[in-house]
Every structure is written in C-alpha cells, then in structure tokens.
Swiss-Prot record:
Its cofactor is Mg(2+). It comes from Listeria welshimeri serovar 6b (strain ATCC 35897 / DSM 20650 / CCUG 15529 / CIP 8149 / NCTC 11857 / SLCC 5334 / V8). Mg(2+) binds at D40, D42. GO terms for biological process: RNA repair; tRNA 3'-terminal CCA addition. Homodimer. Belongs to the tRNA nucleotidyltransferase/poly(A) polymerase family. Bacterial CCA-adding enzyme type 3 subfamily. Its EC number is 2.7.7.72. This is CCA-adding enzyme. Pfam families: PolyA_pol, PolyA_pol_RNAbd, tRNA_NucTran2_2. It catalyses: a tRNA precursor + 2 CTP + ATP = a tRNA with a 3' CCA end + 3 diphosphate; a tRNA with a 3' CCA end + 2 CTP + ATP = a tRNA with a 3' CCACCA end + 3 diphosphate. A single active site specifically recognizes both ATP and CTP and is responsible for their addition. The lineage of its organism: Bacteria, Bacillati, Bacillota, Bacilli, Bacillales.
Length: 393
C-alpha cells in the first residue's frame, strides 16, 4: 500500500474508533488505481465538523462552512470533510447551501466524474457505487449521474474533463461529450484564474493533441481568454511536441506565438498571468515568432539567458534542432553578461569627471558597455578610464 495512505491511516482509524465512517476519497484513490504518483490525500467522514474537532486535539477551521476541518496528525495536516449534499447552484460554481449528511453514497453522488467518486476505507477496500473502476479500466471520463446536471452545477467541470483527457490519456464517454457541447457556453461564468490553472495542467499532459482537438470540437476555445476565432491557429499548436516537463513560460510563449496577437501584453493579461511571466514572454515573443535559431553574441547579451533559452525551448517543441548547448557556450564567451559586470560604476564617472550627475552618466555607461561587449576595450577599470580620456592620477 502507498506510504501516503499508510501515514494518513491513523486519521481514519480514530474516526472509525469513535463510531463514524471515514474514507480516502477523490483523486488520491483514482491515482492509486492508475499507479500514478500521490502527493496528498482527501478524507471524507460521516462525522460532522464539531464531532471531528472533538476527536482530534489539533484542528483548524479551514473550510468549516462547507464541512472541511484540517486535522494535524503525526506532524502532517489532512483535510477532513463531512459527507454533504449541496443545494442549487446560483452562479454555475457555488452551491446555495450545504447540508451535512451521514451517507457515503449521497456524498459521492455530488462529485464530478465516476473515476473521482470512489472511496477507500481503513482496510483498503474500495466502495464504488458509480462504477468508477470500470470507467478507469475503459479509460473513460464519465460524469456521475446526468452529465448536464454536473456541468450546470460547476461549469469548470467541463474544462476539467478535457484536462483529465490530456493528463490521463482517457476519452470522454458519449453522454459526457454531448453534455459538454450542449453546456459549453456556461464556461463564461467561470473565473479566469480557475480556467488558467486547468489550461496549464492540460498542456502538461501526455495527450495534449487529443485534448485540444476535443476542446475545438465542442468550441470551448470560444470561451477561453483571447482564443475566440482562433481554431485554425490552435490545430497546428496542438501538434507541437509538448510534454509534462514543459514550463509555464513556454506554454504561454507558445500560445502567444500560435495566435499571433497584435498586443501580446493584453492577451496574456486576459489570462490573469503574473507580471513577471508577461514581461518574460513579451521579451521572447519577437524572437520566437520568427523561429530564431542563430544568434550573434550581442543578441544573446541583450536578450539574456532566460529569454534565449525560452526561445530555444519553443523552437524544439516546434520541431527545430535543440541548440541550447551551443548557445550556452557562445554566451559564456561574452566578456560581460550584464551592465552590472562592468568594472566601473556611475560613481567612478562622477569622481573622474568632477561634474554634476545627469543623463550623461547613463550615456557613458552605455558607450562603455558597447565597447566592452565588442571587445574594443578590456573590462578593466584603468583601461576604461584611459579610453574615456580621463588622466591617471
């Protein structure tokens, strides 16, 4: 049995000893059945939140309104959630009310897909009222109950379906795919931040091409930031050589290059990306758009290692030769890698010139930077001083 489950087992045992039901649920059970890496576990119980808090001496009210209490056990924290049913969904995301219950089956019934609606007890026996194991054997993503109802409860589940398709290399069952197509417009009610997280996970899966093809088939791109009308650009984009090691920066640079937006910054901001990511992708965009493979030393210097490495990575994904080693070697031959590496500072210039600070300092440092970079002069303080025409003291 997986060590993650064994370490968390005392939590289940304490709950059952107190007279309650308790199970491992959700993604951890699914991934166990798929022999995938498990990083953490979720625990569901018939104990109500206050009852959970009575059993464990160290708890935190992390989501108590929805029945979740974080329990500290053996120096680890575990989320323990009470079985619950949910009222109507008012915004295609959040239930209007949550009711705590004692029935495992009713709790599993509210979950998104059958493969995620399997529970495992303290004896590691599986409880699978919706045939999630069969779906896993058939490599099938199948909604629990009526697919349209599940998607209308939380529209993000449609994005999750396609993400799971990519991650697990599964396929959608017919009813789930039909419901996806029928309800796809509801995705516009989902926050961009949640969509962005799912997109990145999708792009790191082994079945990216199939996932994006399904996404395009149901016209999901219409409701993704900046991708409406970009079907013809996304078809070849899906065929690039993506893999799970792909970084987020490469994903966003690749998408920007594929759709060729006039304003890259606005496109990336629409996905609510961090400013650092937007800035880096912007710096690399023009190089990547042209598929730049061959660089002069000065180009490597002004682009910087992070940018030229990013451009090379997207080139490789598009089928070009990997030139990272030779680019790194050429970069290492540069006399300096940034202006900070210059042997002089603005303070030196002020001392030598004996005049007030002004724009002339930046202009002079730029001139020195260019001269050192072209190796017209050595990056040596005395040498630079003489070259600038200041006499030695």
């Amino acid at each position: 049995m997986n060590d993650v489950f064994l370490k968390a087992l005392p939590v289940l045992q304490k709950l059952t000893t107190a007279g309650f039901e308790a199970y491992f649920v959700g993604g951890s059970v699914r991934d166990y059945l798929l022999c995938r890496t498990i990083s953490d576990v979720d625990i569901a119980t018939s104990a109500f939140p206050e009852e959970v808090k009575e059993i464990f001496p160290s708890t935190y009210d992390t989501g108590i309104a929805h029945g979740t209490v974080t329990v500290r056990e053996n120096k680890e924290c575990y989320e323990v959630t009470t079985f619950r049913t949910e009222g109507t969904y008012e915004d295609f995301r959040r239930p209007s009310e949550v009711t705590f219950i004692r029935s495992l089956k009713e709790d599993l019934q509210r979950r998104d897909f059958t493969m995620n609606a399997i529970a495992m007890d303290e004896h590691f026996e599986l409880h699978d009222p919706f045939f999630g194991q069969l779906a896993i054997q058939n490599k099938e993503i199948k909604a629990v109950g009526k697919a349209s109802e599940r998607f209308q409860e939380d529209a993000l589940r449609m994005m999750r379906a396609v993400r799971f398709l990519s991650q697990l290399d599964f396929h959608l069952d017919k009813e789930t795919e039909n419901a996806l197509q029928k309800n796809i417009a509801l995705l516009q009610h989902t926050s961009v931040e949640r969509i962005t997280v799912e997109w990145v996970k999708l792009m790191k899966g082994p079945a990216v091409k199939r996932a994006i093809n399904v996404l395009l088939k149901v016209e999901m791109e219409t409701y993704l930031p900046g991708l409406k009308g970009e079907k013809s650009a996304l078809i070849p984009f899906a065929s690039w050589e993506w893999d799970k090691r792909t970084t987020e920066n490469v994903i966003w640079l690749g998408l920007a290059v594929a759709v060729k937006k006039a304003n890259v910054t606005s496109f990336l901001k629409a996905w609510k990306l961090p400013n650092k990511t937007i800035q880096l992708v912007n710096q690399a965009y023009q190089y990547a758009l042209n598929g730049k493979e061959y660089w002069q030393k000065e180009e490597l210097y002004y682009a910087g290692k992070e940018v030229f490495s990013l451009v090379n990575e997207i080139n490789v994904i598009r089928g070009q030769e990997n030139k990272q080693n030779e680019l790194d070697q050429l970069y290492e031959t540069l006399p300096i890698h940034s202006k900070k590496d210059l042997a002089i500072t603005g303070g030196d210039l002020l001392e030598w010139a004996d005049k007030s600070a002004g724009p002339w300092i930046k202009d002079t440092l730029d001139k020195v930077e260019s001269a050192v970079l072209s190796q017209a002069i050595n990056n040596d303080k005395k040498h630079i001083k003489r070259w600038l025409g200041y006499h030695e003291e």
